[in-house]
Amino acid sequence: MGDDGSINRDPDALAGPVLFYNEVVIDHFMNPRNVGELDEGNTDGFGLVGDPSCGDQMKLWITVRAGRIAEIAFKSFGCPGAIATSSMLTALAESKTIEEARSITDDDVIEALGGIPEKKRHCSLLGVRALLAAIEDWERRRDGKEGRP
């Protein structure tokens, strides 16, 4: 993320590793889906996760209507793989029931992207972990438990 919270979609970020990413991954990096923030006052769940080994971080917001993810948005600070997998995760989770969204795995995200390099596999963990954290936050709020973890 840039200083203003925007995602760095500089094509030069792909200059070296572009040969390692397929067209779907590059598209989700250059044109991430559901990027940005949802209004905190109107969200039902929030997840914040990071990977200390590489410095990647992801924030994810959801709104839930009738047991389905009605809106989902993310902000990610990380490599092209982290941004692309976060984007794909939100595309997969949008409109799903909570249980369907909860069942999305790292492998589902990687498969939907057509694969990512093995050394970037850890990037796919952020989106799934952030989604699970947002769902847990929604459940706490729904059940009337105070505060976030």
Features from the language model and the residues they span:
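Immediate flanking context of iron-sulfur cluster ligation sites
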Residues: 68-77, 111-114
